[in-house]
């Protein structure tokens, strides 16, 4: 049994193998899954309350050579009041990103691998916007935190409620701002771009390695370059690095489980779509050319942002090198 804490796996305990079937069955009962079905993957959820904290547990089971595996993802509903500063955004990146989310229309992308904090950043961005003066709507899978004053919709594959179908319905709900949990296909990308061109501010996540590759990823999906160049406001790429333990500052102690780290913060790379970059996108420039143009316009790479954290004594060089590339 292993826990992923601050992005790294730790073995916690090795239960007796004889307990395996009973543990899996109990989890499946709690998650309202079919305990007799052992041949197919299943997904479910468990809602728990620990004191005043509401915990949502996402359960995924998968058959394997040695029996079923189960992975549990914990979502603490009480941690919804996040700010951009709390996720680690500072200085010029914060100022420029706030400028992007204050625009009346266009699309902003937040990109990175799974577990890099993209959705948390989107929630923090929505928290900056006035939900009383704007009709803010989201489509997510799953809804990770409940936001007051925001209309949140969760996709449901069992009834064929996809991102694209939910987005079409949301556009009939008079939204000002739309948040899309993830752009997974051309249909979703197309609706998102069209929404941003018709007077809506759209915020969405995408799975790419850096800011420049988000542009080529969308064009590879089939989005027309002239539409993307007209609608894209900017791309924020990010990773999470572990922070030094405040008690031992990296040497390892009982407070951090001898790892030297507790908690995480973000390193960011913000590409703002200037006229020069719009021209590059329109002309179907390569990823390298778009990155070069962005650097000329003042974009700082994630590794450079990480250097700031190293200099401030927040994290180690090894951590920054672990999650970023040249």
Map each language-model feature to its residues.
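Short, flexible helix-loop junctions that flank or precede catalytic/ligand sites
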Residues: 1-326
